[in-house]
Amino acid sequence: MKKIILSLLLVATTSAFAQSSFKGTLVSTDQKPISAANIILITLPDSTLVKGAISDAKGVFELPNTAEHKKIIIKITHLEYEPKILTPTQSQLGTIELTPATNQLGEVVLTARRPIIEQKGTRISTNVAQSSLQNLPRAEMLINFLPGVSTSYTGGGFEVFGKGNPIFFINNRRVRNLDDVYHLSPKDIESIELETQPGAEHDNSVGAVIYIKLKKKQGDGLSGSIENEEYFRKNGLHNNSWANLNYRSGKTDLFLNIGAYNNFKNHFYRNNELQTFTTPHQWRVTTNEVSDNNDKSAEVKVGFSHDFSDKHAIGASVWGGITPYSGHAYTQQETATYRNNAIIAKGLNEYDQFNQNKDLNANAYYEGKLTDKLKLQTDIDYIGQRSNNQTDLIEHNLLTSSAQKVHKHQEASSNWWNLKATFLQQIGKGALNYGTELSNQYRKETYNDNALTTPDIKNTEVRSAGFASWAYPLGKISTKVGLRYEYADFGYYENQQKSEVKSRIYRHWLPNVSVAFPWDKTQFTLSYVRKIKRPAFYELSDYSAYSSPFLYDRGNPYVIPQLNDEWTALATYGPISASLMYGHIRNAIHNDYSLSAINPNVIEKTIRNYDHYNLLKGVLNAQMQIGKWMPKLTLTYYKPFAKDVLPTSEAAFSAELMNQIALNDKWLVLALFNYVSKGTEREYYMYEQRSGVHLFVARMLFNQSLTIYGGVMDAFNQLNNHSEFRNPYIMSRQSKNYENYCIKVGIDYNFNTTQNRYKGHGVNN
């Protein structure tokens, strides 16, 4: 009878384990929580790995028990601690202490630590979870600490080894709104990989790809974060507020994001000097502008994701935003016109602008493992945009005491659909990545003012692409070859009539190839890619849009695509990485200025194809952890070989030094310095140096769930653009004072950070 009771108790206990989860907390010998440890469930006697989990920032983990009545053990591993094996007798494992992993060499103690930076082929990986980078208050700051990543001072955003703005993936899910990236908590990030040579599966305009891998987390319930930032400027105030909520139940996540962005009389200064050389006169127009921005914007995102199993997952999201929903921008512009150094006109122009954009984005995806060697990832995207831009301009002639009113009104609507399917198939030692991408766009635009006459514009665009890439290892050498074919049918309509001159059909083959190999302790990658830049619909228009009394904007229907053959060498040695890129650009598309054919007293800004030229860009990055200090230095050299092609071809140099100092677990100091020399940026010459100093202090509270930070940005207000364009007839100088100097204060609170709505795995995993 006792044996029967004992057997029943064992069966009941085993059943209870099979239906529950093992929970525990990992701490070090000094009782500090251990994050990013691997907790593995193993069945005996076959030593089969059944389930895995990772401890969070508090050292807490939850390991689902799916062993189905088998004998089990739990193995805990961490790069900095000795492995530990447990034979569980109950689901609550309590507090588990791990011993540091050390190798004793006399009196020297070596602690095991994974390198922060590693290069694998064309990718450079940063181990965020095992470095002090996870303590940064914001993901935006973290991205700036990635190797080869620097702030872009031309188009905003980031550059990766000088290759322009990258695109982002979170757990191999493409995100089109950077706010999704900026609002991630660095503590939730396991690692980040930089793909310096995107393959054929990406649009050729993509210069680099940043893959963010989040920590695997378990647990049901509500989680989220609340964030707020205040920018106190010398003139004006800017405010950003966000709320991110996620609810998980089983294998389903529901999420909601809300953001608000407000400007209160933010000042912006701009000075222009435009000179025109004609026979027999020399004309010069100077302008000084002061703008106040008072716009208020808002955005909302909702969505869900669901895992049917470890092999199949779906998800969808909808994002909507209004920029702005209220608030006008006011500008006062003082002008003076000179002919042969004698003033002939003096004006005061007053602008009242309300440029509103309404955006609606949607995404749905499926990803699955169809067989052991075949994966599929499918995305359907929609982007809808509605814009309503109005400007009321009063032009005062101070010499004649007269005034002229100009009203500009532009409305546009656009609908864009995109379908992309990507397959990844393992064939022996190699991997074949192939798929297709289809898109359709329809856009209408009306523009009118009481100074110029323009037609109603309609654009249609149908695109299709097929791509394939083959990766294969040859010993220690990794090779990858890819080919992408793109077809685009672009229709341009004016007043419902198709313009055959501006309508285009494009067909292009775009190859790429890369070879990666080690040499002693250095990892090298050599790559080649062909890229194309096609003119946008608005760049093909040949009507003039009123910008100011002396300047019109105009497209060019005769522009043809720009082709770029790009060769790159990338090398990584320990904490140092370097990139050298050489490009041959054909039919380069750049801005140009000329006299207007409509009004000889007006300058037209347009675009055109320039002759071929070559470009050299080198980037050197050094980054390491020195005790509590992590410095990162990025040096960039840019040199166009375009004499007699572009208006300028002088070299440019930039340096960026970032410093993170972790005083302890609660205090963090950031010191950022950057410098940009005079030199060429595209077709412009930057005639003034730029530099910036940024200092921040962050304080973590409540076991790092609450972060308060503050500091000064651009302490000396030196990150302002001073550009110049010259040709035989025109000299245009522009000075922009962004009033970057400000005091920035922020607060970020994360609660129940055990859920993760980005649950995809992606075809590349």
Please identify what each model-predicted range represents:
Residues 297-325, 349-495, 518-523, 577-578, ...:
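Face-selective signature of the C-terminal outer-membrane beta-barrel domain
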Residues 459-461, 501-504, 532-586, 603-616, ...:
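Outer-membrane beta-barrel signature, preferentially recognizing the C-terminal barrel domain
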Residues 140-173:
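Extracytoplasmic beta-strand/coil segments of soluble accessory domains associated
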Residues 45-60:
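Short, acidic Ser/Thr/Gly-rich low-complexity loop/linker segments typical of extracellular
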Residues 91-98, 107, 139-142, 157-159, ...:
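N-terminal periplasmic accessory domains that precede
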Residues 40-42, 75-81, 93-132, 163, ...:
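Short, acidic, small-residue-rich periplasmic hinge/interaction motif at the N-terminus
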